[in-house]
């Protein structure tokens, strides 16, 4: 099995080091994450643009008619559930903190911040990791469908790993200062080469270290 360091370095050689993102407002980042659940980036972005077009602030979103809110974000799919989750999460933030702000998470350690976020309605380990990594630059490792697939094929996580356990395995194995880079480059590789359901192994630069490719039952060898 290849080491995380080896895979990270191979990916860096191919895809480079991703540019750092501007830190979004944490509450708006949470809203985007809820919109992104079970949809693609394009639909998430369209739903978020429609949301920002109709409502000026997170408080306006929280106070909106739920059916109207759901209609506004319908392009994201599961819009009724997402509208309810969004408003419930915002209401819980304000109830517990006295304001619609997540800035206090910056002062928490990683595990404490994760626990606080995953206690919100509709926020699981991946959603919490996205907010903490992209907004607060904490070493939380988001595991989406691409990261999960590529990591499993490369043997970086156990065969029986779940999405939830994969977060912990990859977080522990990845240096804090390379979590964002590794996350982004695994996604790039998953979209370009290590696709589902059939990967483009003939185009891959890691076949010499990939257990999935080297398996005797792999017809793409």
Per-region residue spans from a language model:
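Catalytic cores of DNA base-excision repair glycosylases
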Residues: 2-220
